[in-house]
Amino acid sequence: MEALLEFELHGLGAGLLLLILVAAIWAGAINTVVGSGTLVTFPVLVAMGVPPVSATVSNAMGLIAGNFTGAWGYRREIVQVRSVLGRLIPASFLGGVIGATLLITLPEEVFGTVAPVLIVVSLVMVIAQPKLAAWVRRRAVERTDDPDPRTPQPEDDAETVARKAADSVGWPLILLVFLAGIYGGYFVAAQGILLMGIMGILLAATLQQANGVKNLLVAFVNLTAAISYVVVDYLIREPDDRVILWGVVAIIAVGSTVGGFIGAWVGRRLSPVVLRSVIIALGLLALGVMLRNLLIG
């Protein structure tokens, strides 16, 4: 027991590692219900003294398992509009590579300066998420009465649904998905909310289909970013300068996977307001810590 209490990993004691695991489980559940689980785990890591870039990289890599679990849960909806994936996944892929490369190659001081702004942007999106989701739902309902032949209708067969979705994928949608990929590869948090807003406006699909595509795109951005992190960390950086904390990655992966499985059960019993309040509180904590580090050094 004493040996367990004295155990350390990356300079973090057993108690702090257990806290990371709990935060990762909570993040997995949050992602299942309202998204933005990164704003749970990232502040916890930063508050423990983990450098911001290492916290972002390790967190993003650890959450990948939960991302693909969420996408698998929407596999039926994704298959219905699979015709859009051939153009949207490459856009997310390229954006994720660029965002991840910027994160891991620019001086850490740049991220330390930019991250507080991105946290504020993420918190604004989290706060606005209910109104955005309600607007997207209203738009989906209005589309059912829309005479525009490109709009999905309840009576459409599978081939028609796929064709209408594919026809709606123009350069504006591809460009915005690409930019969302850069944001996701660089900071991770709230990219799902951003994608839902984009696709709610431009993609001819139901709300559930758009949510399925969103889950898959987020998973690909995070996977692409993770591969980029590893390549840059091991091919460019010196061993003493590497930022990936593999122990933290493993703990978050286990926790977020467990959280993803229990999220649906817990999420139906907890108010989204409560979950969102926790995200905002932890996001403000991270903002305070980073501003203090920025001002004090």
Predicted regions and their residues:
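Residues within membrane-spanning alpha-helices of integral membrane proteins
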Residues: 17, 60, 115-119, 123, ...
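Transmembrane helix-loop junction
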Residues: 47-48, 100, 104, 113, ...
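Selective hydrophobic functional segments
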Residues: 61-117, 121-122, 223-273
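Transmembrane helix exit motif
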Residues: 68-79, 117-163, 285-297
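Cytoplasmic-side transmembrane-helix entry/capping segments in multi-pass membrane proteins
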Residues: 81-91, 115, 139-141, 212-219, ...
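Hydrophobic alpha-helical transmembrane segments in multi-pass integral membrane proteins
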Residues: 98-104, 177-187, 225-234, 286-297
